[in-house]
Amino acid sequence: MEASDPTSNGHRSVLGRWVLVLAGWTCLAIDPAAAETQEIRWEILAEGLAITLWEPGDRCEDEVPSSVILKADPGRVRFATYHFRDEGLAEPPAVRDWQRRTGASVMVNSGLFLEDYSYLGILLKEGRSIGGKRHPIWQGLFVAEPVQPDLRKAGILDLSVDHFSLERPAYREAAQSLMLLDRKGKLRVRRSGRQAHQTVVGENGDGTILLIKTTAAVGLRELAECLRVGLPELRQAMALDGGSSSDLLLAPDLLGKFEGEREPAPWQEFVDGSGQRHIPLPSVIGVFPRSEEGK
């Protein structure tokens, strides 16, 4: 029998099929959707602060709207909680009034509250309670400004596994709310069918803090799923208050550097106080530059 010519048409067609298969594997390996996960383009606001308008798109089956994400480095900024009664005020201010009063670079709503404006859960300021009792079900606790210098400067505690003593708190600032996504990647909210504007605080694997505000209504479960898929660097996340209380505001001096540009930044209308009606907020979290001493 005559030996086969390896360059014959039959062998060339087999070789061609293998080339196509390998090319397909290569395409899968550099799937654009995976590559999108994520080329986030951050705009620097100040030392330790950056911002972007994140577009989840078809990564989240178009169920989740674009969201403003503010990234904060706890080594360069500090966090402080506020409640209007602790400030000696008769009525809760709106977010812009909170910013003017405190001088914060960034102001964001905190967790949920009752009809009498009492905070629902743990709320600490400078190590003392300015909120209610520990909520028995909600397991998310945003903490900042540790008592001991060897602790991280800010982060999220999962109260289902992390210890936190109210008698001897390890952090001076704390706000309790609903856990969304834990450090094992487990979703901690159920699908409810209810939608609202949402505010989320997240913690990346490198310790940076994310403040996330959706630009439209979305369910918490859908948002949690989207964050897990679209932001793989996100280690854990918890929901703050939502609906009409969802608010994120930048100080005028941070926005001033973008004045005079031909077009406003795509995120600007959502954080300059012009894009929505602002209701009074009993409690807020402020972000401030950290002193040179790092205190």
Kindly give the residue locations of the regions a language model identified:
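N-terminal secretory signal peptides that target proteins for export/translocation
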Residues: 1-14
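Bacterial N-terminal signal peptides
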Residues: 18-29
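Zymogen propeptides
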Residues: 34-135, 150, 212-213
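Short, solvent-exposed aromatic-acidic interface loops
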Residues: 84-87, 157-164, 214-217
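Active-site neighborhood of phospho(di)ester-bond hydrolases with catalytic His/Asp-centered motifs
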Residues: 107-109, 237-240
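Catalytic metal-binding/acid-base residues of hydrolase active sites
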Residues: 112-113, 243-245
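Active-site-adjacent helix-turn-beta-strand microarchitecture at beta-sheet edges
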Residues: 113-187, 192
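Conserved, well-ordered active-site substructure
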Residues: 117-136, 187-238, 245-295
